[in-house]
Amino acid sequence: MVSIIIPHWNGVDVLSECLESLKKTRYSDYEIIVVDNASTDNSVEWIKKDHSDIILVQNDKNYGYAGGCNRGAKVANGDYLVFLNNDTIQDQDWLAPLVRRMNSDSNIVAIQPKILNYFQRDLFDYAGGTGGHMDILCFPFTRGRMFLNQEVDKGQYDTAETCFWASGTAMMVRKDSFKMANGFDEIFFAHMEEIDLCWRFHAMGLDIWSEPESVVFHKNAVSMPMYSHQKYYLNHRNAQLMLLGNYSLLLALYLGFIRFILELIACVYAMVKLDWNHVTGIIRAFWWLLFHPHQIWQKRKRFKKLREVKDNDLSLIHISEPTRPLYISYAVFCLK
């Protein structure tokens, strides 16, 4: 069985379209779990009335994407879990290719579909594309999207491949491995928690794949606006939290210092543009990291217990010397 877990906070209209699409899925053995993160609208009442066949988990507060998914996983009956954003719709045949790919190799622990833009359906989605990668300074990008540039889907990525991370927009994982890796780290709340999870999977010697035969469409930035203070804060904080928490100590300190300098440059650049949401997001991220060393250290200890693969053996992207200045400048000035 496949358990489809949808964390949700407000927006009945968004969730309604997602559920109507899901129920057209051409795959018989699945269940739908909606985890309500203490919505303040009529989401819970609507689900109980119009979708009584769905498993509903009601949280006492908003635990974010990470916490919502973890609580959904606890009640899941399937051997495979699919974590799915509520602002997605799915191709009718989206689920079977993911299951087939997962069944093909016991070392595959997570897999994502091809994720396209909901509003312009020949365009790769910002949040997922066809599989995520990350450079050594923890700047993430995807096949189909480099920073702010999204490619048109012309079939150029229609081959299933390994990747560094699967997008939390729509990702399938093995339930037993998810539990072994301790699930999503709830410190993240939202944004990059799936990258952190996939990093742990890699450290355990497991593989992440992208399966473009499966297609999902994503609206993006419905629950949190693209240029909001909170989004900036979580992106900047969580990238540095991963870097400091997951690398070996000396490498974390070395790369952490370089990333800190780049963050300062990004902050100054945002000041020049009078982009105060971005400025305050970066400063708030620094503030959190400065005053939570214990939580960072505890994260390092948890990661170390799982590690079977050294840093040098991880499939992180190393940018070549000739293109590095251009790449770094683009990463800093376009960082969202």
Identify the function of each model-found stretch.
Residues 158-217:
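A short, conserved alpha-helix in the catalytic core of glycosyltransferases
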Residues 81:
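Short aromatic/hydrophobic "clamp" motif used to bind/position activated sugar donors
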Residues 88-139:
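Conserved donor NDP-sugar-binding/catalytic core segment of glycosyltransferases
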Residues 20-29:
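Short, acidic, metal-binding catalytic loop of nucleotide-sugar glycosyltransferases
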Residues 59-76, 86, 97:
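Glycine-rich, basic loop-to-helix element that forms the pyrophosphate-binding segment
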Residues 126, 132, 136-142, 147-176, ...:
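A recurrent flexible, glycine/aromatic-enriched loop bordering the glycosyltransferase active site
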Residues 317-336:
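Single conserved hydrophobic/aromatic residue that forms the stacking wall/gate
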